[in-house]
């Protein structure tokens, strides 16, 4: 629901005015942070930096790509001639299974110089053998295979971490496009397993628990999803299996999307029914196709899955709720991006276009209007 207030025109008449027409702040209950919304700035001229627009990849197999089947990676290893998804250990991991502890395994008692050794593993998951086939262009069955891969890695890595420690997290994510620091255009994502729960998911779960404790155990994201489905003004697309994609009320990025269940509590992707998983594959394709169609370009983004940090031992009592965050940088066109700088680094996030307007534009960006890559041909490198 969009808040309104009244405005006097000088007489005794008061007319309702939407807060979307004025500068205001919105609160993000997931992270306990605010975002400053400045609708009038959408009209300002732009003479700043412009990016080189991304060009669609049209080569099914690139002999120089480190991720294509049969190719040699920088380590000298050769990829197998894989036909579906392909998972392997990251050649340049940010975490190590057994890092050398510096000084002591204990956290320092000094509040100003605290540190602790951590361990973990980093994996790469290639979504498809074809170099040119993004998730938006895949068949639903192929996206389902990606989801199966995520489930397998989450379960396997989670089991290893649970055997080693009582704490930890398996974080699944994808960076798409050079603008988001992606070094290879081949469709792929990453899985980082950590011996700790990172700040973002940890904060979300803390706020889920706090919300539930004051509301007879109800779940924040499920309550929020149901209200968004009822209001519809920020809904981008919805699937009858129980998934809804919205530009969240508190979105910081211009065309940010939050994808979540709206019918029941689902702590992790391991608890999805077959119908829910196919529905998730369908709505993922829908969302990513709308992104590509918005500015008629391969749309850059960072996408991540938040769920129970490790596979839940008791799903019924788990506080997490599975959901996907999409953070795309583009602001006005394929060449103009948003920069999180200045006030946003030193104060709080700020946006120009209101989330409701962003949702309208994404709803109008019909996924079937833009021709996808020809993915009906068999893969033959």
Swiss-Prot record:
Recorded catalytic activity of this chain's protein: alpha-D-galactose 1-phosphate + UDP-alpha-D-glucose = alpha-D-glucose 1-phosphate + UDP-alpha-D-galactose
Associated pathway: Carbohydrate metabolism; galactose metabolism
Enzyme class: transferase
Gene3D superfamilies xref list: HIT-like
GO biological process: galactose catabolic process via UDP-galactose, Leloir pathway
Positions that bind Zn(2+): 65, 68, 131, 186
UniProt: UDP-alpha-D-glucose binding residues: 90-91, 175, 190, 338-341, 343-344
Keyword terms: Carbohydrate metabolism, Galactose metabolism, Iron, Metal-binding, Nucleotidyltransferase, Transferase, Zinc
PROSITE patterns in alphabetical order: GAL_P_UDP_TRANSF_I
UniProt key word Disulfide bond: no
Binding site for Fe cation: 204, 306, 323, 325
Active-site feature positions: 188
EC number: 2.7.7.12
TM region positions: none
Cofactor note: Binds 1 zinc ion per subunit. Zinc binding seems to play a structural role.
GO CC list: cytoplasm
Family to which this protein belongs: Belongs to the galactose-1-phosphate uridylyltransferase type 1 family.
Oligomeric form and interacting partners: Homodimer.
Classification via PANTHER family: GALACTOSE-1-PHOSPHATE URIDYLYLTRANSFERASE
Name of the protein in its database record: Galactose-1-phosphate uridylyltransferase
Source species of the chain: Cryptococcus neoformans var. neoformans serotype D (strain JEC21 / ATCC MYA-565) (Filobasidiella neoformans)
Classification lineage: Eukaryota, Fungi, Dikarya, Basidiomycota, Agaricomycotina
Gene name of the record: GAL7
């Amino acid at each position: 629901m969009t808040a309104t207030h009244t405005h006097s025109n000088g007489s005794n008449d008061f007319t309702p005015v939407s807060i979307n027409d004025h500068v205001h702040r919105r609160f993000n209950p997931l992270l306990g942070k605010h975002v400053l919304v400045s609708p009038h700035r959408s009209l300002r001229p732009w003479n700043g930096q412009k990016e080189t627009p991304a060009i669609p990849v049209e080569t099914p197999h690139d002999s120089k790509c480190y991720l294509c089947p049969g190719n040699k990676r920088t380590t000298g290893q050769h990829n197998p001639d894989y036909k579906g998804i392909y998972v392997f250990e990251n050649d340049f991991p940010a975490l190590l299974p057994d890092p050398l502890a510096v000084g002591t395994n204990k956290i320092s008692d000094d509040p100003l110089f605290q540190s602790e050794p951590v361990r973990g593993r980093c994996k790469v998951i290639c979504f498809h053998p074809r170099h040119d086939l993004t998730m938006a262009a895949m068949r639903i069955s192929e996206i389902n295979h990606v989801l199966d891969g995520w489930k397998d890695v989450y379960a396997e890595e989670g089991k290893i971490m649970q055997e080693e420690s009582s704490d930890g997290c398996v974080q699944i994510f994808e960076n798409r496009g050079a603008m988001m620091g992606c070094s290879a255009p081949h469709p792929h994502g990453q899985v980082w397993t950590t011996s700790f729960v990172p700040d973002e998911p940890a904060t979300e779960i803390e706020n889920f628990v706090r919300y539930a404790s004051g509301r007879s155990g109800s779940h924040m994201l499920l309550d929020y999803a149901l209200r968004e489905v009822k209001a519809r003004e920020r809904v981008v697309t919805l699937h009858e299996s129980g998934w809804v994609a919205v530009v969240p009320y508190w979105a910081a990025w211009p065309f940010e999307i939050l994808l979540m269940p709206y019918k029941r509590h689902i702590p992790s992707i391991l608890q999805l029914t077959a119908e829910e998983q196919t529905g998730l594959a369908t709505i993922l394709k829908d969302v990513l196709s709308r992104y590509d169609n918005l500015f008629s370009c391969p749309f850059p983004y960072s996408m991540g899955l938040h769920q129970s940090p490790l596979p839940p031992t008791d799903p019924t009592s788990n506080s997490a709720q599975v959901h996907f965050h999409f953070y795309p940088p583009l602001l006005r066109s394929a060449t103009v991006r948003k920069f999180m700088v200045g006030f946003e680094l030193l104060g709080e996030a700020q946006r120009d276009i209101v989330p409701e307007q962003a949702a309208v534009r994404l709803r109008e960006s019909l996924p079937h209007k833009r021709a996808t890559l020809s993915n009906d041909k068999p893969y033959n490198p």
